[in-house]
Amino acid sequence: MTKLNELAPREGSTKGRMRVGRGPGSGKGKTAGRGVKGQKARSGVAINGFEGGQMPLHMRMPKRGFNNPFRLEFAEVNLWRLEQAVEAGKIKKGAELDAAALIAAGVIRRELDGVKLLAKGEIKTALKLTVYSATEAAIKAVEAAGGSVTVTKKAKAQAEA
């Protein structure tokens, strides 16, 4: 019977590692297959995106968009996540929840610019939520379960609708 410590590849099926820079007799001595001098002969990797002086692709492409310094980022909470926290005993049924309570319950990690309630999943427990914004479907689902949603400040998408 073959033992695990006696396993070895078949004779001739693998090639040994080429040791470069070990004299002219090895066939890979002196410059070790790197050619002569220059940037690519040196140690380290070639510069990413460098195309030998030709204008690189990333600089030929047009610039687009900008970073809005006033952009708002929300901590998103889905209905299934709230239901999961209730089942785990982290949130009591009928509890009043705001951003601080959601952080304490471990539903979100941080508030960012506000909490946004989204409608993914189902909710069966009545909860009183106070959030920065919420989708219409999420509000309907919470109210259908016997809870309520208080939106403190409407998001842009809801204000336009």
Curated annotation (Swiss-Prot):
Ribonucleoprotein found in the keyword field: yes
Claim: Cell inner membrane is one of the keywords in the record: no
Gene Ontology cellular component annotations, sorted alphabetically: cytosolic large ribosomal subunit
Gene Ontology BP terms: translation
GO terms of molecular function: rRNA binding; structural constituent of ribosome
Gly residues composition bias: residue spans: 22-36
Assembly description: Part of the 50S ribosomal subunit.
Function: Binds to the 23S rRNA.
Protein name: Large ribosomal subunit protein uL15
Name of the gene: rplO
